[in-house]
């Protein structure tokens, strides 16, 4: 029994070595490639292992391309994989382009994929146009009525401009700008409601797909509604603003009038003070005139009589209105 121990150990070591070799050498994948008509060396697959490339990610797409009649270099696929591209999607896009008779070289497809675009979706949109629906866009006609429109834009991907071309957001923004311009130039909102195709024709004629990754095939107005009366609202707001301005100016004038009244009252009080001051000087002047002989005694008494007569007249004038008031009561 002991004589079989070295043989068993040898078999175990051989099995371990074979397992290690098979983990680095994808023999099953190599056999599949050979039977699929893909000429790839076993050492090429081993090299992929050392370059941290999963051979199945390269060989399976290569088999699909070969079966579809597309000649692709395995080194290009590996380089695209190492650059972060999706090899499987790339090959699917090349096959779809070939079936649709679209000229799509490998280099352009790889550039589109590495640029972050969905290359397969781009090919599909080139064959089957895509419909982009815009949100409701509000615009105001010349008569002040708000018109809200929603459009459907049918686009086809432009393979030549996918790299560096603007996307759907730019298309939506340009269509919205065209709708606002067209509605804003309309004389009345009724004209827009009667001819909604006027919007699509005007917008389509502006060449909105310039510099984008899409080619606009048609623009259709899907829905159109009437919104607020912006003109009337603006006039109301302006009237309110004018009213507030007029009220502010009136309040300013009232304040100035009150201030002027207070100034006049102060001036009257000042004049009265001066009169009182002047009246206080009269007795002094009379005494001086009598003392210096400039005024006689009879003149003085005549003046006193005149003053008494004046006071009596003032008293009568003050009593008469009160008596009349009592008679009326």
Swiss-Prot record:
InterPro entries: FloA. GO terms for cellular component: membrane raft; plasma membrane. The keyword Cell membrane applies. Its main location: membrane. Keywords: Cell membrane, Membrane, Transmembrane, Transmembrane helix. It comes from the Bacteria. The chain crosses the membrane at residues 4-24, 27-47. It is a multi-pass membrane protein. It is found in: Cell membrane; Membrane raft. Homooligomerizes. Belongs to the flotillin-like FloA family. HAMAP family: FloA. NCBIfam families: PRK13665.1. Found in functional membrane microdomains (FMM) that may be equivalent to eukaryotic membrane rafts. FMMs are highly dynamic and increase in number as cells age. Flotillins are thought to be important factors in membrane fluidity. This is Flotillin-like protein FloA. It comes from Alkaliphilus metalliredigens (strain QYMF). The lineage of its organism: Bacteria, Bacillati, Bacillota, Clostridia, Peptostreptococcales.
